[in-house]
Amino acid sequence: WIRLGPLSFQPSEIAKICYIFAGAATLERLFHKRNLTLFIVLTGVCIGLLGLMSDFGTAAIFFVTFLVIAYMRSGDFATLSLICGGAVFGAGIILKFKPYILSRFASWGHAWEAASTTGYQQTRTMSAAASGGLLGMGAGNGWLHNVAAADTDLVFGMLCEEWGLLIAVLAVGAIITLAFFAARACRVGRSSFYTIAACAASSLLVFQTCLNVFGSVDLLPLTGVTFPFVSNGGSAMMSAWGLLAYLKATDTRENASFAIARKHQRRLTQAARRRVEPIGDPFGTEKEERHEEN
């Protein structure tokens, strides 16, 4: 965290927006190995800095986002396989120098066996989620808020407890809907920059949601990432809305193109109507009728 007087923010959240912008801008033109090399270097620097800050959940999010952007421009599975192999090797080195990270994996899959130690948060989250049922206990009526990070890392359990499983599933479904929207935008997008940015942003949001939801119920190790648009925190909320702006920008460009087409079509229709509208008395019939009356 960086503190500026009474304000504090998490730089990794702001870096998500900048990273997608840099990746989409770097690979917007025709694919070149030089562009991919620069992007790989940028990704390595970002993940390395996140590792120094011990924010390995966000580092995993950056890596998955990198794979999405790189594949969209290259489509080369061989290169991506080598990158994944290097990432596994790097993760092994990190675990060697920071062995405390393994404690998060120690209780993975059997949190109830360590309910009072490393599995404390997950077991409390699962109990609270189960007590909420389908419709929940009501806003503010739960007890999970007494557990540390209940409104950030464990917010899915808090959502299930107070608002019910139905609302929690709808919240996850809303993030998945954004991914379907991004996939549709890829097929009709006019700009490769916005297409790459929209898909990368939606992939980031979906993967981050999976880490938060599955981590809180012990299906994945608890990584400490937030639930987009739901978790408490100004930095996380600003980051989520910033990522959503990429999808909106793609939609604006598409709608703008349709608006231009409709405007052009409207002009053609008006011009055609003017050509076919009858001119007042083109055959002089009124003059003949007046002559007969006289």
Predicted ranges, named:
Residues 24-27, 65-79, 143-167, 226-241:
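Interfacial segments of multi-pass membrane proteins
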Residues 16, 161-182:
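Hydrophobic alpha-helical transmembrane segments
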Residues 33-52, 56-96:
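Hydrophobic alpha-helical segments of polytopic membrane proteins
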Residues 20, 24, 50, 98, ...:
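Alpha-helical transmembrane segments of polytopic integral membrane proteins
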Residues 186-224, 230:
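Loop-to-helix entry and N-terminal half of a specific, functionally important transmembrane alpha helix
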Residues 23-31, 67-76, 94-95, 176-187, ...:
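Structural signal for the C-terminal ends of transmembrane alpha-helices
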Residues 1-53, 213-228, 232, 236-239, ...:
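Membrane-helix boundary/helix-loop-helix interface segments in multi-pass membrane proteins
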Residues 1, 81-171, 190-197:
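Hydrophobic, glycine- and aromatic-enriched re-entrant/interface helices and adjoining loop segments
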